[in-house]
From Swiss-Prot:
It holds the Pfam family PPR_long. Coiled coil: none annotated. It comes from the Eukaryota. PROSITE patterns: PPR (PS51375). InterPro entries: Pentatricopeptide_rpt, PROP1-like_PPR_dom, TPR-like_helical_dom_sf. GO terms for cellular component: mitochondrion. Keywords: Mitochondrion, Repeat, Transit peptide. Its main location: mitochondrion. It comes from Arabidopsis thaliana. This is Pentatricopeptide repeat-containing protein At4g04790, mitochondrial. NCBIfam families: PPR. PPR repeats lie at residues 372-406, 407-441, 442-476, 477-511, 512-542, 544-574, 578-612.
Length: 821
């Protein structure tokens, strides 16, 4: 049955329990003319009414003004609405806590408008309109022009309906939006529009996840009527439905249609049934079906890949080998053997990369087939995803030796992996690979190589790559020069950076907004900032958000704080960027001594309920005045919503308290936030290491605070203190000449099951010397191995620094700081 207001109560109770909310995404964009937009929607989006006029009018009048509808026209227009869709509530009920990140990520990947630029653009427009007018007004407005909507607009609107349903934890609200999406599908059918899988797939996936069987079939019927060619693909979703519900009888009914004894190829519908079974690892049903299916009759390459992924996940070597031999002996199947070997070998659970490569090579040898470029590409990507970049480079070099083409995608995987593992020196091997004839790079590959060369300060290599472009019939672009420009600025080599700009012009490459952003951001004089900004305008380069950010940073760095503030009032600055630019201004002012001004801007934004970048709030905490109130920083930390930002800001506030003699409330603050500190996935232990380091370097040492924190970690949080924590605390005992607490810390090493290494012995030795226990120090030092010259040196320096000289004026003691690494 179709979801409607009269039958909502008939839905299964499972639906209500499965409503999964998420956070609201704020996407805003300008309303420019877009190809494929119906004239009615264009007229709606091109309204010239000012925001002030709209604010003064009622919600109903605001929508009427946008649509250019007079009061007298409303009643007649409303009678002729094409879609009879109930109005929305103005605000969306959200509850973030009940929806997992994994499900959110999975649904984002299925988003209707993700694969189509126009649909994505329209979705932004719909969201932006809802944000400004309210959802009720926005959907009512677009409802008025529904008769003239294009396919692209239908698709985008369906996507927004689904998104709102997914985000809500309100049953009626979610059902209402699914009903509206259904009405749009019916409208598309009635107008003769095809409904594509990228539109109906996420809708059916949502219904499957909510156990809505009747609704699933209603949607499926409309889709089949609108797009008869989708019948076979709808079988895939039907199989997913029964798998999700665990209905073995229905699954078996569909499986019974798959017969491999007739010698004919599988139908498209049968292949879709098999594909769903493989996707969901239905081992019981697949075990029987794969015995009767003729693998050489499978026409879908996607199904073949999924079959071998399934076989790899369950390590079904004998079945995989049989299928590969059958394909090897067939005229068409032999073309796929190498690719299927790579899929199978890389899907085997828990192997090392080395084992995977051995299996890859062995299977190719047994089947007497040569590895293909695409199979090597899969192997390279697998190695890169496993962070085995050196191994991936070895594979690529073998490809070159075999004369196989090294594609731009392979180079991209390598370059991305090098960036991820921070082994920038490996770019030199990429450079040597590029010298072979079997490489087909693109401009993005060159840009990445040039950027990595600058990271290792190999500017000569970066310029060599620019020279190599002509060997591949490629032209240099501004992004390549910008990488070199950024590298020189990073090295504070301004003269060479300016030379890059000159070289760009000589090469016929026009500087872009990023180029001017780098130039402005690295200016230290107001006149230079003005010069580059004027040059940018004369060159016809449009000022972007990044340019305005660079202006703010540059003016603040040159001490022109009022100029930095004036950037925000520039009439050319889009209103949509105001909050981001204010956040940048807060960070720029706070980091350059204008903390009070930064705090004032933040408080104004907070009162206006504007979004502030968490990094800006953290900057306020980090650069706060040492004479400031701790309560202000506590409030700032509390304002941080997401856990990652909060933990960063909270512990920066704790560090401020330790370093500025405001530590009396630290333990209370920790206890107050105990629940949040215990949240899974928050790296609390590493932050405690920093706090103990601050305690160790503070004069006078706050050993009592350190011991209180140690007890809190153990008793309240259930943490085992790290070795670093104990090392820093023991060092604090040295500074405080506190033998009593030093001995307690020494016992903590044993409680935490940390073996006392040489560094631990040396620190305890220093505690004994500093506290004047020469006998204890002598006994302990006898147990320290003295084979290492550095250890001998530290012992001698410690004896000198802590020796007693009662008849002479004591010089300031030199501290021997030991590494905690």
């Amino acid at each position: 049955m179709v979801v409607s207001k009269v039958n909502k109560s008939l839905l299964s109770s499972v639906f209500k329990s499965r409503i999964r909310p998420t956070g609201e995404s704020s996407i805003a964009s300008g309303n420019k003319d877009i190809a494929g937009t119906s004239q009615a929607v264009k007229d709606l989006l091109s309204s010239k009414n000012s925001s002030s006029d709209l604010e003064e009018a009622s919600l109903q009048d605001r929508v009427s003004k946008l649509l250019h509808v007079t009061t007298s026209d409303k009643s007649s227009l409303e009678k002729n609405l094409f879609l009879k869709i109930p109005s929305f509530t103005t605000k969306i009920p959200y509850d973030i806590s009940l929806r997992t990140k994994e499900l959110s990520r999975e649904r984002k990947e299925r988003r209707v408008y993700k694969q189509n630029g126009l649909s994505r653009r329209f979705a932004k427009i719909f969201r932006d309109s809802a944000q400004k007018l309210g959802t009720e007004a926005m959907f009512g407005a677009f409802d008025r022009v529904a008769k003239e909507m294009s396919v692209t607009e239908y698709n985008a609107m369906i996507g927004v309906y689904l998104e709102h349903a997914e985000k809500s934890n309100d049953l009626d609200y979610a059902l209402g939006h699914i009903e509206k999406a259904f009405e749009l599908l019916k409208s598309m059918r009635d107008r003769g529009f095809l409904i594509e899988e990228r539109v109906y797939g996420p809708l059916l996936g949502y219904l499957i996840g909510m156990d809505m069987v009747d609704e699933f079939h209603s949607f499926k019927d409309v889709i089949r009527e609108a797009s008869p060619g989708s019948v076979e693909r709808l079988g895939y979703y039907e199989m997913l439905l029964w798998i999700h519900l665990g209905d073995g009888e229905k699954i078996e009914e569909l499986c019974s249609t798959i017969d491999g004894d007739n010698g004919e190829s599988l139908s498209v519908l049968q292949e879709n049934y098999l594909l769903a079974l493989c996707k969901k690892d239905q081992k019981y049903h697949l075990e029987r079906l794969l015995e009767i299916v003729d693998i050489t009759k499978v026409r879908s390459s996607d199904l073949l890949a999924n079959i071998f992924e399934y076989l790899g996940r369950f390590s079904l070597d004998s079945v995989a080998s049989r299928f590969l031999w059958e394909l090897r002996e067939s005229d068409e199947g032999v073309k796929n053997v190498s690719d299927l070997i790579s899929i199978y070998s890389t899907c085997t659970p828990n192997p090392t990369v080395e084992d995977t490569i051995l299996k890859f090579n062995k299977m190719h040898e047994e089947l007497d087939v040569m590895p293909s470029s695409t199979s090597y590409e899969k192997l390279v990507k697998y190695s890169c995803d496993s962070n085995e970049v050196v191994t991936a480079l070895d594979v690529v070099e073998k490809m070159g030796e075999a004369g196989l083409m090294i594609s731009a995608d392979i180079l991209h995987s390598l370059l991305h992996a090098i960036d991820e593992v921070l082994e920038f020196d490996l770019v030199r091997r990429i450079h040597s690979i590029m010298c072979t004839k079997s490489v087909k790079p693109n401009t993005e590959n060159f840009r990445s190589i040039i950027r990595l060369c600058t990271r290792i300060k190999d500017f000569e290599g970066a310029y060599n790559m620019l020279g190599n472009l002509k060997n591949f019939n490629l032209e240099p672009n501004s992004s390549m020069f910008n990488c070199i420009l950024a590298g020189y600025f990073r090295e504070k080599n301004v003269s060479s950076a300016l030379m890059v700009v000159k070289q760009m012009k000589e090469a016929g490459v026009k500087p872009d907004s990023i180029t001017f952003g780098y130039l402005i951001n690295n200016c230290t004089q107001e006149d230079a900032i003005t010069k580059y900004y004027e040059e940018m305008k004369q060159a016809g380069v449009q000022a972007t958000k990044r340019i305005y950010m660079s202006l703010i940073d540059a003016y603040a760095a040159s001490g022109k704080f009022e100029k930095a503030k004036q950037v925000l009032v520039d009439p050319d600055v889009p209103a949509i960027n105001q909050n981001e630019l204010k956040s940048v201004l807060i960070s720029a002012l706070a980091s350059r001594g204008k903390w009070a001004d930064a705090l004032h801007i933040y408080e104004e934004m907070r009162k206006a309920e504007c979004h502030v970048d968490p990094k800006s709030i953290i900057s306020l905490i980090e650069y706060s005045d040492s004479k400031g109130e701790l309560s202000t920083l506590v409030q700032l930390a509390d304002d941080l919503q997401d856990d990652t930002s909060w933990i960063d800001g909270f512990f920066r506030m704790i560090l401020f308290a330790v370093r500025n003699k405001k530590s009396s409330d630290i333990v209370d603050l920790l206890k107050r936030n105990k629940v949040r500190l215990l949240k899974k996935g928050i790296p609390v232990e590493a932050h405690f290491d920093e706090v103990f380091w601050a305690i160790a370097e503070t004069e006078p040492s706050k050993v009592h605070l350190g011991m209180d924190l140690l007890r809190f970690m153990k008793d309240e949080l259930g943490f085992v203190p790290s070795r670093k924590c104990l090392d820093f605390l023991l060092h604090a005992c040295v500074n405080a000449k506190d033998l009593e607490h030093g001995l307690l810390v020494w016992k903590e090493y044993q409680s935490a099951a940390f073996p006392c290494n040489v560094l631990s012995f040396l620190r305890m030795y220093q505690v004994l010397l500093a506290a004047g226990d020469s006998e204890g120090a002598k006994a302990l030092v006898s147990k320290i191995p003295k084979d290492d010259k550095d250890v001998q040196h530290i012992i001698e320096e410690s004896q000198s620094a802590f020796s007693q000289a009662p008849n002479k004026k004591k010089p300031k003691k030199k501290m021997i700081v030991l590494s905690t690494k």
